[in-house]
Amino acid sequence: MNLLRRSAGKLVVMGALALTGCDNVDWGGVDIAVVPPPPRGSALEGEHAERELGPLPTGPVLYYVRTDSAGGTIVPVGEIGGDSLIPLGAGADAELYGARFISEHLRRGTEFTLFRRGTRVGTLVVQSARVPASGRCRRLPVGRGTLETSVDTLPAGVEFIALAKSTAPEGQRPSIPLTATGGMMRVAPILAERALRARSSQLPGNWSSAMAQIQPFPVSSSGDAGIASTFLVDDQLAVGNDDLGYSLFMIAVPRRDLTGYDTVYVDQSRYENGGKRAPRVIDFLDWDRDGGAELLLEVYGTSRSWYETIGPVGGTRWRRGFAESCDAAVAGAAAARDSATQDTVEGGTP
C-alpha cells in the first residue's frame, strides 16, 4: 500500500511539472528546481574528471617574474620535488586547472619572495591573475603584481626567481663576480672547442660572435664560481630563425686544486635533427635547499620558448632536471647530450 502511495506521489509531481512547462515550480510554499543530469561521458565524471581537473601542487612552486612598465608578471614554472621540478597541469583542462590554481596559489594579495643571483631582493604582491589565451607549452596562469624592492624604480625586463613567502628559502649572497672574468672568457671557448671536436662538429668561424652568453654561478658555499656558457652557430638567443645551425650549452666548474676548470655538462643541439634549442641562463638559486645552486633556463625554439632546469646530482654530476612538455621540447630531446663528459683546462684561473 505504501508503495502505491509513493508511486502516486511521484506521478503527481511529474504531472505538475509537465503542466507548468518550466524548470522551477512553486508548489505549496516549496521551490522545486529540476536540474538535468550531466550527459554520460562528460568532463566531470569519474577518472576523466580527475584528469581534466589535474592535481594541484602540494609542495613549493617555483615562479618566474619579469618587470614591465606597470609592475611585473609572475608565471609558475613547476612544483619543487627533490632535485627536479614536477610539471603543472599536465593533461588537465587549461581553464579548469588555471582557475583552481589561481584560487589556491595566485589570489589577490598573495606575497612572493623575489630572488636575484641567489639573494632575497624584495617582494611581489599579486593584484590579479588570469589564464592566458595561449601559452609557452602549457596555458598556465599568469599573475600581475606590484614589486617592493630596495630600488625605487626598476627598469622593464629585470628577471627574478620567486617562491611564495611561506615556502621561500633564506637565500645567500654568493661571493662570485657579477660578470665573467677574463679567465672565464678565455677558458670557455677552449672547453667548447674540445667538446665540439669530440663530437665531430663544425667549429664557429668567430668564437667571440658564437659566445652568446657566459654566466658565473656559485658551485659551493665557499664561493667558488662555475661557468655556464652558450655558443651558437647560425643562430641567436631569441625565438625565431630556422632549423639550421646548432647550440652548445656547457657547465664548467673549478678543479679541486683550483688550477683550472672541468667540464661537467655538455648539451649540444643540432637543429636539423631535433629542431632549434638555444638555452640561456635566467638566474640561479638553491631552491631545493641541498646546498648547491640550480639554474633556471629559458630555451628558445623557432616559434616559442620554454623553461628547463639544470642542477647538480651527488655533488659531482650535473643533469637536466626539468623541461616543459611541448612539441618543441620533445623534439629537442633527440639532441646530443652528455653529462659525463670531463674535458679539462689546466692553468686557467677560476
Model segments located where?
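Solvent-exposed N-terminal domain segments of exported/luminal and surface proteins
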Residues: 69-186
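Surface-exposed loop/turn elements that mediate protein-protein interactions on large endomembrane-trafficking
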Residues: 252-272, 310-318
